[in-house]
């Protein structure tokens, strides 16, 4: 028997039966960590002393969620820059954890509180790094200071400020499991976090890609119960996202309902992707052509952009958006608004031929790694990125690897039966339908 005490700590529990022994890690915490700021809500640019804090949505500089904060600073003979912050620190928390995207400038970063300044060390790194600040008796965070003996003009990024205690940091996603009960047409499951327990601040459920709120979650037991709409003879997709106070995300999805024997289009009879294509049809994402879907036909880049725009429900007029592509005039009129919508969101960026010109290549087949990259740019940050395990992982381009890893972890990508991903291979319309259905 294992009995948890009221103190904080971590270790392992080993259970033995004969020659069989199993060891599992255990963390004992007294209370959940607390998100101080994730910068997900847009805020007005704040100006300090030779420093400026602004809202950032450029996803390559986001660690958790969809946004972060950008801190620009300019240091001259004064030797430092300062930006004011205003966060109250509740009792029982004595540490602040937060992510910093460093500029490798060598400047010193310090957190300022009402009890003094906490040195966080040198910005001698590029990319994201988790920093911790001991708060002592402080009751408020009042600012950040960047100092340097030499002149500097640069910027760093901040994300996911989390109040902690006892030296705890959390970089592990919650554990999430789901089961479907056909008799009651419900999905049940459990959500637990090693640090926060069942006090999970983020639970999101989608049904066929749309937000769904007919569920209950017990923050004492971690039990999740989702009551689904009445069965209609079709298969539907239920996805659940769980996020802890530190911004770590986990995701699970499953099919609910009955696989349909009715073909979604004339050419979908007995096709393996019929349920996914039926989802596209009833959601208004694809209406086919002359009663057919052409499931095994490769999809072009402009067709994929249009499907993504429809998937997102983008009905706005983007005619005023100026595309930078040298081949913009080759984009079909029916695809132009979709391409502009995806460009304005930073989903499509084009490619260069080495002459400095950008090309969209609208009629070219979209490759599997290109499609996954576009989907990845739509995905919030915070999911774990495991090692790529496809047999041809070495062929995946560096600009796509992060997204292939993330979508694989999320269960959206499974690869082929031979273990390959085939990054340069074209995607068929059926494959795209399946990915969007799971997404």
Q: Where are the regions that the model predicts?
A:
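Surface-exposed, short loops/turns at beta-strand junctions within beta-sandwich domains
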Residues: 4-9, 137-138, 227-235
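Extracellular acidic, Ser/Thr/Pro-rich low-complexity tracts
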Residues: 102-104, 190-197, 244
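Extracytoplasmic soluble-region selector
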Residues: 1-32
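Extracellular beta-strand ligand-recognition surfaces/modules
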Residues: 98, 130-166, 420
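Feature responds to low-complexity, polar/acidic, surface-exposed segments characteristic
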Residues: 33, 121, 170, 250, ...
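Extracellular carbohydrate-recognition regions
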Residues: 29-52
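Short carbohydrate-recognition loop motifs
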Residues: 58-79
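Extracellular ligand-binding interfaces
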Residues: 73-140
């Amino acid at each position: 028997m294992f009995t948890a005490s009221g103190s904080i700590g971590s270790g392992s529990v080993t259970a033995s039966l004969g020659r069989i022994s199993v060891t599992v890690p255990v963390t004992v915490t007294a209370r959940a960590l607390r998100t101080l700021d994730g910068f997900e809500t847009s805020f007005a640019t704040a100006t300090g002393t030779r420093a400026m804090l602004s809202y950032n949505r450029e996803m390559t500089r986001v660690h958790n969620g969809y946004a972060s904060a950008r801190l620009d600073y300019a240091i001259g003979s004064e030797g430092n820059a300062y930006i004011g912050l205003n966060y109250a620190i509740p009792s029982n928390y004595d540490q602040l954890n937060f992510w910093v995207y460093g500029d490798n400038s060598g400047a010193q970063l310090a957190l300022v509180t009402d009890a003094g300044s906490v040195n966080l060390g040198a910005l001698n790194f590029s990319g994201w790094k988790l920093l911790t600040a001991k708060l002592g008796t402080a009751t408020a965070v009042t600012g950040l200071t960047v100092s340097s003996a030499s002149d500097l003009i640069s910027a760093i990024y901040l994300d996911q400020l989390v109040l902690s205690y006892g030296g705890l940091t959390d970089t592990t996603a919650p554990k999430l499991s789901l089961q479907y009960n056909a008799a009651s047409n419900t999905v049940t499951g459990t959500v637990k976090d090693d640090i926060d327990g069942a006090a999970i601040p983020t639970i999101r459920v989608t049904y066929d890609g749309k937000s769904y709120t007919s569920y209950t979650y017990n923050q004492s037991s971690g039990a999740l119960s989702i009551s689904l709409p009445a069965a209609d003879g079709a298969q539907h997709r239920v996805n659940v996202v769980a996020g802890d106070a530190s911004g770590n995300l986990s995701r699970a999805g499953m099919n609910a309902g009955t696989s349909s024997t009715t073909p979604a289009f004339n050419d979908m009879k007995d096709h393996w992707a019929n349920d996914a294509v039926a989802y596209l049809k009833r959601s208004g994402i694809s209406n086919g052509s002359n009663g057919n879907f052409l499931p095994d036909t490769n999809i072009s880049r402009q067709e994929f952009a249009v499907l993504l725009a429809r998937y997102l429900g983008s009905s706005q007029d983007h005619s005023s958006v100026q595309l930078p592509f040298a081949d913009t005039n080759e984009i079909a009129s029916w695809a132009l608004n979709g391409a502009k919508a995806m460009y304005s969101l930073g989903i499509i960026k084009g490619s260069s031929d080495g002459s400095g010109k950008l090309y969209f290549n609208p009629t070219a087949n979209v490759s599997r790694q290109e499609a996954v990259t576009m989907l990845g740019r739509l995905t919030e940050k915070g999911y774990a990125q495991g090692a790529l395990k496809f047999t041809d992982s070495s062929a995946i381009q560096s600009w796509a690897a992060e997204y292939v890893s993330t979508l694989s972890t999320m269960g959206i990508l499974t690869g082929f039966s031979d273990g390959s991903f085939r990054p340069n291979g074209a995607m068929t319309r059926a494959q795209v339908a399946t990915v969007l259905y799971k997404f």
